[in-house]
Structures are given as structure tokens and as C-alpha cells.
């Protein structure tokens, strides 16, 4: 008789990996199922719960598509496409509010969405990446380093923020402002088009499904990426409205005020796909910069195209071309949002994101969320921090790292492309 084989214990790293996967799947299952246990509307449990797994699946599909697309176009362009698909719920919510001509809610939703992206989204990415690094290597992650090509997104974020200072001082959002903001976004896409795709050597760092797609022939890659983008976008489109309605029942049940829902709950839910994609990448610290740029791309999208859409929809609703006037409270909301995003842009202009910066941004967001009456004080703190960063950049470092990185990328790709002679026919 043969001797019974002895089963060797799995290596500690494998056991830790299994436990981590079990925890992640259990958490995902809880996140998907838990909403259905809330006070259900008409139709029963499954009719109320289906939007949640659908949104999760759509987020994974478009994340895989973007991860593959960065080898066919630039990573920034892939993330710009991703941001458009992910922003569909937010655009839908803002369009409905603009059509109903509720200016105070327009501003609340728009500014709340942007402040959530920076104040909660960016630190959340850092937190997930740091937790992943600690559980895997028992090392503290102190900084997320950006790639040189990410300077395009960082500098592009500054343009609409500066223009919104003009909007703040004049107190109106006009169709001309919308045209300027759209022009900024088109310029941003034009620059991204000049940046080349990622090197093929980096494909080995992909997850299993994107890696298999990139092993297909070129036509197969394009077809698979197109299907993933289209399928994920379609699922997101179908689930967006039921998803928001399900969460609205949560808000009503827990007594959340309508204004609070419009400013914080609705943007959080409409940005849920963006957060899912970013967390998917952030769990691998080496991909944390891509996760961060996913959020930055969403910021650019909302500062430009979302803001440009508002006066257009509002004018159609009124029946003639007009502008949106802001009162003192709405202008204060805009100024606070500008200050926060300006600070975020300056912090990333060093081509890295430090743990102290992530913590500071999160604490300031939490302060103005928990204590709305400290609105003015938080705005002053933001601008004081902005002034400090400008002083350090101009006097101490005497250079803007993002600008230097951008010029290197521009000379390496855009200028070189113009200098290469066209092939003889």
C-alpha cells in the first residue's frame, strides 16, 4: 500500500492572500445585499436590490476596459473615456435639477460633488493603497508617486479652477462661460491625444482578465475593449436611476433633509462607480497613481463639461438663452469648492501625494461636512494652505514639478511627432 501523502501547509503569504480575498468578497457581498434589507419600496426585495450589483459589475467592466485601453491610447485618454461613462449618473442628476430651475440645488449638487471627489475620494484612495501595502508587506506607504504623463491631468485641473474665480467674482454662470469651459476640456483631450500608449512590457502587471484581453490579436483587443466599455456603460445607464431612487428611500427613512441629500448623498451615490474603479486600482499600491488620476479626470470633467451643461439645460427649460445668477450663499459655496480644488491641484503639482496631505484634505472636508457653520473659516484655511504651497513652490523649490514634467512629455512626444517626416508615397 502506498503511504498517505502529507499535505504541506500553504505558505503564509498564500494563506494571507486567501484570507484577504475571502474578506473582500464577504464585504462586497454585504455591500450588495445590505441595501435590499433597508425599507423596501414597491416590488419587494430583489426589485430594490438589483441596481447595486449591476453598478458594481458595470464599474468592473469599464475599469478593465480602461486598463486595457491605456495600451492602445494614452492612459489619460483612457481615463477620460472612463470618467465620461462614470459621470453619467451625476450628469443626469444635475440635468434634472437644472431643468427644474432650482438654482440653489444646482449649486449644492455641483459643489458637493466636486468637494466629495477631492475631500473624500483622494484620501480614500491613499487609505486603501496604504492599507494594502501594510497588509501585504508590513510597510507604511507615505507617498503616492505620479508618472510624468500625469502632469497633463494635474495642470489641466488648474485651468477651469482659475476660470471659476472669474465666475465667482461676476456672480453668474452664462452660456459664454459654458463655451469657454468646453473649450478647456477639448484642449485637454487634444493634449492627451499627443501622449503615447503605455509600453507593452507593463502588460504583465495587469490583472487576469485585462491581461488575457491584451494577449488577443489587435482586432480582438479593440473589439473586447469596445464591448467592455459599451456593456459597462449600458449597465450603468440602466441602473443609475433605480440606484439613486433606492438610496433616496434610505435618506427619507433616516430623516436626511432634502438639501443635505442633494449636496452630499446624491453626489456620493452618483460618483459610486468612480469610487469603485478607483478602489479596484488602489488596492495595488503600484496602481494607486492611476486610481488617483481616475478621480482627477472626473474632477476635470465636472469642472468643465458638467458646469457647461448647466446653463444650456437651464436656458432650454426657461425657453430662451439666459444666465444663472448666484446669491451670496451660492457664491460662498463656489469659493469654498474652488479653494479646495486649487489646494488639491497644487499638492499634486509636486508629482506626488503625501500621507500628511491626504490626511489634511480629509480633515478639512470632514470639518466643513460636520460643521457647516464653519464655512468661512474652512475657506480661509484652504486659501492659507494654498498661499503656503505657492510660497514653497516659488521661493523654496523655485520650480513647479508638474510643469517641468509636462514640458518633458510635450517635447518627447508632441514636438517629436511634428519633426518626424511623413512617409513617401
Predicted regions and their residues:
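Hydrophobic alpha-helical segments, chiefly the membrane-spanning helices
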Residues: 2-425
Amino acid at each position: 500500500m502506498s503511504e498517505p501523502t502529507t499535505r504541506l501547509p500553504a505558505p503564509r503569504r498564500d494563506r494571507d492572500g486567501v484570507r484577504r480575498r475571502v474578506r473582500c468578497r464577504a464585504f462586497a457581498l454585504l455591500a450588495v445585499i445590505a441595501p435590499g434589507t433597508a425599507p423596501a419600496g414597491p416590488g419587494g426585495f430583489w426589485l430594490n436590490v438589483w441596481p447595486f450589483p449591476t453598478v458594481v459589475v458595470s464599474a468592473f467592466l469599464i475599469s478593465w476596459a480602461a486598463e486595457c485601453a491605456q495600451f492602445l491610447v494614452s492612459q489619460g485618454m483612457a481615463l477620460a473615456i472612463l470618467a465620461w461613462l462614470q459621470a453619467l449618473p451625476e450628469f443626469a442628476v444635475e440635468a434634472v435639477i437644472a431643468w427644474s430651475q432650482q438654482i440653489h440645488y444646482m449649486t449644492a449638487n455641483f459643489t458637493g460633488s466636486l468637494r466629495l471627489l477631492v475631500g473624500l475620494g483622494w484620501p480614500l484612495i491613499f487609505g486603501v493603497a496604504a492599507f494594502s501595502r501594510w497588509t501585504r508587506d508590513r510597510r507604511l506607504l507615505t507617498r503616492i508617486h505620479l508618472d510624468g504623463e500625469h502632469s497633463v491631468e494635474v495642470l489641466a485641473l488648474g485651468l477651469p479652477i482659475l476660470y471659476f474665480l472669474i465666475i465667482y467674482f461676476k456672480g453668474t454662470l452664462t452660456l459664454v462661460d459654458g463655451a469657454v469651459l468646453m473649450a478647456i476640456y477639448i484642449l485637454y483631450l487634444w493634449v492627451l491625444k499627443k501622449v503615447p500608449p503605455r509600453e507593452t512590457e507593463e502588460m504583465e502587471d495587469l490583472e487576469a482578465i485585462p491581461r488575457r484581453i491584451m494577449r488577443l490579436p489587435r482586432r480582438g483587443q479593440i473589439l473586447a475593449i469596445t464591448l467592455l466599455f459599451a456593456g459597462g456603460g449600458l449597465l450603468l445607464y440602466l441602473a443609475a436611476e433605480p440606484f439613486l431612487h433606492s438610496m433616496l428611500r434610505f435618506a427619507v427613512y433616516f430623516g436626511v433633509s432634502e438639501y443635505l441629500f442633494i449636496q452630499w448623498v446624491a453626489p456620493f451615490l452618483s460618483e459610486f462607480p468612480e469610487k469603485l474603479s478607483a478602489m479596484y486600482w488602489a488596492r495595488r499600491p503600484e496602481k494607486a497613481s492611476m486610481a488617483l488620476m481616475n478621480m482627477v479626470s472626473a474632477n476635470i470633467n465636472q469642472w468643465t463639461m458638467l458646469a457647461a451643461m448647466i446653463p444650456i439645460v437651464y436656458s432650454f427649460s426657461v425657453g430662451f438663452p439666459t444666465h444663472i445668477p448666484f446669491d451670496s450663499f451660492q457664491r460662498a459655496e463656489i469659493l469654498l469648492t474652488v479653494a479646495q480644488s486649487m489646494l488639491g491641484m497644487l499638492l499634486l503639482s509636486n508629482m506626488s501625494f503625501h500621507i500628511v496631505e491626504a490626511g489634511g484634505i480629509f480633515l478639512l472636508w470632514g470639518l466643513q461636512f460636520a460643521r457647516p457653520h464653519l464655512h468661512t473659516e474652512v475657506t480661509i484655511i484652504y486659501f492659507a494652505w494654498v498661499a503656503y504651497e505657492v510660497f514653497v513652490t516659488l521661493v523654496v523649490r523655485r520650480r513647479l514639478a508638474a510643469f517641468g514634467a509636462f514640458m518633458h512629455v510635450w517635447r518627447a512626444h508632441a514636438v517629436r511627432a511634428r519633426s518626424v517626416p511623413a512617409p513617401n508615397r
